[in-house]
Amino acid sequence: MSTEPTNQDQAPIDEALTQEVAQDEASLMDELTQANFRVEELEQLLAESQAALAERKDVEMRAAAETQNIRTRAAKDVEQARKFALEKFANELLPVIDNMERALQGTNPEDEATKAIYEGVELTMKGFLTSVEKFGVKQVNPQGETFNPDHHQAIGMQPSPDFPANTVMMVMQKGYLLNDRLLRPAMVMVSQGGPSVDIEA
């Protein structure tokens, strides 16, 4: 009796192996399909996470830029407030300076009776102007300068052979700047130039 399997005995084994391979193949296909679905889910989650991260980075960058802008604006506002905090106070001092100038104009420095008063007012005024200049207040005396409507207020215009047209020929009241910003315009008389020459005459 031979121990070799016959074709009849081999057929059920082959069939069982074929079924087992088919089942394994089907199981592998199911696992592969599930793995593909899981990969797609993970890819979608990764894309969503990357988009959320990009959005957060954008929001963070915008917030940082806005914070920097606020800091810059705040520093500028503080600097402006510091520079011009004295504006109201400086405006209150201008009439005092004007009165000292009028006192000097109304006093004769050659008259022995008023010479001491003149010198006292003159020294006081020089000291006062030096003090206010330390805080950014500067006097504008545009005598002989070209008229500038940003810093001068014209009281009137007159013909003058001594001054070219559009030149400040007389300062009625000096102007003032506070840190290069106009505090009060200078009140001026502006020249229209010399008299016109009649060509036909």
Swiss-Prot record:
Compartment(s): Cytoplasm
NCBIfam families according to UniProt: PRK14139.1, PRK14140.1, PRK14150.1
One BP annotation, GO: protein folding
Family: Belongs to the GrpE family.
PROSITE patterns from the UniProt entry: GRPE
GO terms of molecular function: adenyl-nucleotide exchange factor activity; protein homodimerization activity; protein-folding chaperone binding; unfolded protein binding
Taxonomic lineage from the root: Bacteria, Pseudomonadati, Pseudomonadota, Gammaproteobacteria, Alteromonadales
Its job: Participates actively in the response to hyperosmotic and heat shock by preventing the aggregation of stress-denatured proteins, in association with DnaK and GrpE. It is the nucleotide exchange factor for DnaK and may function as a thermosensor. Unfolded proteins bind initially to DnaJ; upon interaction with the DnaJ-bound protein, DnaK hydrolyzes its bound ATP, resulting in the formation of a stable complex. GrpE releases ADP from DnaK; ATP binding to DnaK triggers the release of the substrate protein, thus completing the reaction cycle.
Gene3D superfamilies: 3.90.20.20, Head domain of nucleotide exchange factor GrpE (2.30.22.10)
InterPro entries, per the entry: GrpE, GrpE_coiled_coil, GrpE_head
One cellular component term from this protein's GO annotations in UniProt: cytosol
CDD domains listed in its UniProt record: GrpE
SUPFAM superfamilies to which the protein is assigned, alphabetical: Coiled-coil domain of nucleotide exchange factor GrpE (SSF58014), Head domain of nucleotide exchange factor GrpE (SSF51064)
Protein name, UniProt field: Protein GrpE
